[in-house]
Amino acid sequence: AEAEPGLFPVKLPDGTEIESEPERIASLSPAATELLAELGYSDRLCAVSRYCDYPEGLPEVTAGSSENPDIDKLTELSPDVVFTMSALAEREMYTLDSAGITVVTLSAPKTLEDFGKLYGTAAGVFSGSEAGQAAAEKAVSELKSSASGVELGTFIYVTPKLTAAGSDTFESAVLSLCGRNLCTGAGYAELSGETEAPQYIVAADSLTEADISGNAAYSVMISSGAKVLFVPAVRFERPSARLSEVFRALSEQLSGSATAE
């Protein structure tokens, strides 16, 4: 949608100014690309990162990644805005800024509010802060409604690295919409045997039952009656409306285990 006149310049929450509605953009992150496509701006992409694989029909031109951007390629393409999920080096920022390219850094969320801010910032770049606010509220309310009807009770979440996600992580924030995380520490940690056994061990789908039961702390929980459920962990890494797939996976497995009993 075309932005109304008078909406620009837009000041983003981190102070970045967007002078006018961007016509050509580049993304250095699969998460940013998916979000921009969901908001309807994939047709403005002139370059993506070499890891971007969703949705279909992305430009074939690549410009590195957030960690290792191809600054020469970006200055040559000269998009209005470059989206990244992690801060670029000062020197890279300076080079792009000197070339008249604005860098918008989207932060990986840790809370539902952060998840909304992702949408707010991305939508605000194109349509102003009011539209950004509306996009943020819509994203959070849709995520909450996708969790309704799923009841986990108590859980812990096991990451692809076999660590447990603490209460200040995004995985915990999302799964806490339908249950209570018993791993109350900060960040991602190895669990000691002292953590109370949850009703469910929710695990990244790159793991197997054997990976979980082969871990001392988790095997104790399983013998105390914890059931193992698997969810698509990549959804937490690329937060978008496709997070609903996490709740769909839980719902299918929970209804399956209920009928199996």
Outline where the language-model segments fall.
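A short, structured surface patch at a secondary-structure boundary
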Residues: 23-87, 183, 215
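Short secondary-structure boundary segments
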Residues: 29, 86-87, 108, 160-161, ...
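Extracytoplasmic ligand-binding site segments that recognize negatively charged/polar headgroups
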Residues: 91, 107-123, 154-173
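Structured C-terminal subdomain patch of bacterial secreted/periplasmic proteins
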Residues: 69, 110-126, 133, 204-261
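Alpha-helical, coiled-coil/dimerization segments enriched in small aliphatic residues
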Residues: 50-54, 166-190
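Proline-aspartate-enriched helix->loop->beta-strand connector
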Residues: 66-87, 101, 190-207
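Short helix-initiation/N-cap motifs at beta->coil->alpha
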Residues: 5-12, 61-72, 89, 186-192
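Bacterial Sec-exported substrate-binding components of ABC uptake systems
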Residues: 1-33, 71, 125-156, 249-261
